[in-house]
Swiss-Prot record:
Domain of life where this protein originates: Bacteria
GO biological process terms on file: lysyl-tRNA aminoacylation
Major location category of this protein: cytoplasm
CC annotations in GO: cytosol
Family of this protein: Belongs to the class-II aminoacyl-tRNA synthetase family.
Residues involved in Mg(2+) 1 binding: E421, E428
Reaction(s) this enzyme catalyzes, per UniProt: tRNA(Lys) + L-lysine + ATP = L-lysyl-tRNA(Lys) + AMP + diphosphate
E.C. number(s) listed in UniProt: 6.1.1.6
Entry protein name: Lysine--tRNA ligase
UniProt xrefs under Pfam families: tRNA-synt_2, tRNA_anti-codon
Source organism of the structure: Aeromonas salmonicida (strain A449)
MF (Gene Ontology): ATP binding; lysine-tRNA ligase activity; magnesium ion binding; tRNA binding
CDD domains membership: LysRS_core, LysRS_N
Record's subunit section: Homodimer.
Length: 512
């Protein structure tokens, strides 16, 4: 008879099942004694606040203060030493050590209750602040209660939860186990709050526009389609709020912004998620140059207020990284100039005609679509050869009109627009332009987009007749911009993939 062996996966599953069985038995015993999930404990302190306020107090000063606290949190570590134990509790603000002794608790409680609790259980504690012999701020427990019994164990302390997909699927576990993840999403919250404060202080009005639309618009992207049963019509999840926000500017709301969720039925990558968050804003009586100035001010303010410095360290996965300085003026280059800068063998004449630009693209092995104009080819060359080279904050201006259906044409060269995209760390972070407010030109460009869609371009825009009607009522000179919040948080937290900064990113369902 051959010897049977088990794989590590089987061993782990068996171990997990055994531990869960034991924890369920403990829960059953707790139920027999009363409600094991009480909801009458109220804390008055958070761990981080206690460290901030009392972290510099000496042992003698803490004794003199006699500070009584009520805290609650999850048991992350525990050391049982006979009649006394140390444990670490984790709450929303951090961690703090508690000191529990048998003699401070009701008779029998320490051995029959406390010692049988598990890592991951949530407890409420009352006690006095003190400093241990090793100098650690701690709570000497006078009362402790079990508030929630955890039926599943925490990840192993040293292995943690390191698998990228597992962290995304079980974000709750990732947040419990990984301090860096908690910091990332705390910074994300601060970024959103900082953006909102910045625009509110400049007298922008926050608004909400439809997330389900009859005609998707505002960006070149493939939309998600749904069906509205009551109206019996197909609708589209928003790919951008732009056309609705500009309708509001027509209506007299001259400075508007929306922190919005957009949906694009496209690929998933380290910097793309089908559902993502942006800040999009519009201001009347401004142009794209004003927006570039505003963007510099915004990013500089956010970095200083949230990170405490205008210089940040950023590294893509596997790379050494670089220091990005928001304190210096941002570089500004036209698209053509940037191509010439990073492609020394290319001349201005090479980008002057469709045929010569196609020859450059062919030499660079860039795939082109049928029916593309000169502007499309130049943009493709830029995206393939320049975009990833833009590491320090850089505005790329003068985007071709062929790829900018909503932007105002440049007064000097109508083949390009008063548009920019902002790049940092080799990635696009923002897109802004002086808005096209010529209704007749907009109607023509919409028709060009329809022609491109009929020729097979799934990402070309739909014709939005109502938006053209709105422009016919008069849109004041306006500039508008969108900034990707997910990518900005990636930058501020030195995250390598967009999934690390979205709490619940899109994932394929697991097979059972």
């Amino acid at each position: 008879m051959s010897e049977q062996t088990t794989t590590p996966e089987v061993d782990h599953t068996l171990e997990l099942n055994n531990e869960m069985t034991e924890r369920r038995s403990k829960l059953a015993a707790l139920r027999a004694q009363g409600n094991p999930f009480p909801n009458d404990f109220r804390r008055d302190s958070l761990s981080g606040d206690l460290h901030a306020e009392f972290g510099d107090k000496s042992a003698e000063e803490l004794v003199a203060l006699g500070k009584q606290v009520k805290i609650a949190g999850r048991i992350m570590t525990r050391r049982i030493m006979g009649k006394a134990s140390f444990a670490t509790l984790q709450d929303m603000a951090g961690k703090i050590q508690i000191y529990v002794t048998r003699d401070d608790l009701p008779e029998g409680f320490y051995n029959e209750q406390f010692k049988k609790w598990d890592l991951g259980d949530i407890v409420g504690v009352e006690g006095t602040l003190f400093r241990t012999n090793t100098g650690e701020l701690s709570v000497h427990v006078s009362t402790i209660r079990l508030l929630t019994k955890a039926l599943r164990p925490l990840p192993e302390k040293h292995k943690g939860l390191t698998d990228q997909e597992a962290r995304c699927r079980q974000r709750y576990l990732d947040l419990i186990a990984n301090e860096e993840s908690r910091k990332t999403f705390m910074i994300r919250t601060k970024v959103v709050a900082g953006i909102r404060k910045f625009f509110n202080d400049k007298r922008f009005m926050e608004v909400e526009t439809p997330m389900m639309q009859v005609i998707p618009g505002g960006a070149s992207a493939r939309p998600f389609v749904t069906h509205h049963n009551a109206l019996d019509i197909d609708m589209y999840l928003r790919i951008a709020p732009e056309l609705y926000l500009k309708r509001l500017v027509v209506g007299g709301f001259e400075r508007v912004y929306e922190i919005n969720r957009n949906f694009r039925n496209e690929g998933i990558s380290v910097r793309h998620n089908p559902e993502f968050t942006m800040i999009e804003f519009y201001m009347a009586y401004a142009d794209y140059i004003d927006l570039m100035d505003l963007t510099e001010e915004l990013l500089r303010t956010l970095a200083q207020d949230i990170l405490g410095d205008t210089k940040i360290r950023y590294a893509k996965e596997g790379e050494e990284g670089l220091t990005i300085d928001f304190g210096q003026p941002f570089q500004r280059l036209t698209m053509v100039d940037s191509i010439l800068k990073f492609n020394p063998d290319v001349t201005p004449a090479d980008l002057a005609t469709l045929e010569s630009a196609k020859a450059v693209a062919k030499h660079l092995h860039i795939e082109l679509m049928k029916g593309w104009e000169l502007g499309h080819v130049i943009t493709a060359i830029f995206e393939e050869t320049v975009e990833h080279m833009l590491l320090q904050p850089t505005f790329i201006t003068e985007y071709p009109a062929a790829v900018s259906p909503l932007a105002r044409r440049n007064d000097v060269n109508p083949d390009v627009t008063d548009r920019f995209e902002f790049f940092i760390g080799g990635r696009e972070l923002a897109n802004g332009f002086s808005e096209l407010n010529d209704a007749e030109d907009q109607a023509k460009r919409f028709q060009d987009q329809v022609n491109q869609k009929e020729a097979g371009d799934d990402e070309a825009m739909f014709y939005d007749a109502d938006f053209v009607t709105a422009l016919e009522h008069g849109l004041p000179p306006t500039a508008g911009q969108g900034i990707g919040i997910d990518r900005l948080v990636m930058l501020f937290t030195n995250s390598h993939t967009i999934r690390d900064v979205i709490l619940f990113p899109a994932l394929r369902p697991q097979q059972k």
